[in-house]
Amino acid sequence: MLELSFFVAFKRFSLPFYSFKPLFMSSHEKNQTTRRGFLGSIATGAAAMSIATLSPLQQLHASPETPHIPNPDDPEKLFKELNGKHRIVFDVTEPAWLVPFAWPRVFLLTNMATGTPEKENNVVVVLRHGAIPWAFDDKTWDKYKFGEFFKVKNDKGETVTKNAYWKPAQPFTVPGFGAVPLGINELQDSGVKFVVCNAAMTVYSAVYAMQNNLKAEDVKKEWDAGVLPGVTVVPSGVWAVGRAQENKCAYCFAPMG
């Protein structure tokens, strides 16, 4: 969404610059002017992006109160309890299909194959930015059309209409591995911890509210209520990634879709 806003702004403000320059300019003049125009376009595009996204982001910084975190537990608690022999955090930023759930399972399976039982490993999956829909129940997916809003596609390129990784009806099949339990609930049973970014929930719920003439606080309240059992709401995804690494988790970026 932010990237698209920047791209549109960049194209809008950069095209006129090239359209009206005399054809007889020297090569040096063209290079200098092109450079100035490019830098000016970047600045203008960045300013336009800031204006376009200011309203929802202001809720995080200008509000007299800290954004609501529905989980009553100390968000630090999960990270302080990490004490496994092998620890890893998967940083998921997009609603990718399969990868955010396959890689944690592969980490556990291959550690088991090399002598470390599941319970002696720690896996944290951080769902942030565009990946937050995986943290919600089907009721929330259906009401807010998450598949369309977050542009979630399955492996066939079809828009997803429900959380396919919450209590899946049948195991997912991974080439070379066969049927593998990749459901969020199944991974939780193996000790995997899922957390979701409250900052992203706040911004995206506000954007949804603006697009549909709803009250942002009402939408956010329903999104809070729709978080899956066992998924911890943390102040932000980047906060969680930082805490995981402070507690000796290796880092793995898992955006592939």
For each predicted feature, which ranges?
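N-terminal secretory signal peptides
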Residues: M1-T33
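N-terminal export leaders
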Residues: T33-P56
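C-terminal segment of N-terminal export signals and the immediately downstream linker at the start
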Residues: T53-H86
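Solvent-exposed loop/turn segments at secondary-structure junctions
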Residues: P95-W97, H129-W134, F194, A199-Y204, ...
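Histidine-anchored nucleotide/phosphate-binding helix
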Residues: V99-T116
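Acidic helix-start/capping segments at beta-turn-to-alpha-helix junctions
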Residues: E118-T140
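A glycine-rich helix N-cap at a beta->alpha junction
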Residues: K145-Q170
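Glycine-rich, aromatic-bearing surface loops/beta-hairpins
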Residues: A209-G257
